[in-house]
């Protein structure tokens, strides 16, 4: 029985249901030293605004303020056989989809799995920035199916204890779940 091995599995911590929400944040109530890594699963998201872009913001003071500078690199492809966006940039958020924004017509939406590695600096690497990897799928405003792989990082070495999912405009509905991974 692999359950006896312990460690390494993801534990469901919370699912929030967004209903015309501007953001969903996971605070230090859930981002604790009990878990090393965290995963956010964004499911069945529908945006109020056509052309919204999904983003992650991180806080070092439990959401009193959010960091305003990040680095990211991404590669995305559309079902129209075109590159959605490739490149890297400094940004005010970690945008977790390619340059093609999310459509909100019938049948269109956004889904993503975001893994955040050791945000509380428990690995003995206190001078390391918090990094994430996001794999996102959405329909753009032209109804192209788009897939994007994004790597993002803070520009500070401080522990992150609050992580927020949002769009750059409008509100959204859907499910946003948080999971934690223990190492033992």
Short names for language-model regions:
Residues 1-184:
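Surface-exposed molecular-recognition determinants
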């Amino acid at each position: 029985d692999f359950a006896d091995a312990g460690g390494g599995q993801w534990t469901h911590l919370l699912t929030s249901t967004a209903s015309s929400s501007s953001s969903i944040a996971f605070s230090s109530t859930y981002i604790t030293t009990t878990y090393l890594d965290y995963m956010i699963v964004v499911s069945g998201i529908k945006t109020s605004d056509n052309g919204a872009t999904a983003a992650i913001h991180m806080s070092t003071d439990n959401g009193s303020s959010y960091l305003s500078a990040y680095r990211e690199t991404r590669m995305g492809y559309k079902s129209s056989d075109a590159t959605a966006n490739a490149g890297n940039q400094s940004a005010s958020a970690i945008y977790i989809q390619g340059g093609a924004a999310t459509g909100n017509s019938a049948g269109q939406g956004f889904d993503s799995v975001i893994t955040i590695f050791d945000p509380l600096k428990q690995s003995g690497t206190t001078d390391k920035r918090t990094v994430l990897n996001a794999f996102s799928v959405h329909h753009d405003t032209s109804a192209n199916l788009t897939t994007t792989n994004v790597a993002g990082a803070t520009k500070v070495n401080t522990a992150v204890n609050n992580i927020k999912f949002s769009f750059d405009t409008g509100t959204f509905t859907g499910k946003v779940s948080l999971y934690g991974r223990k190492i033992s």
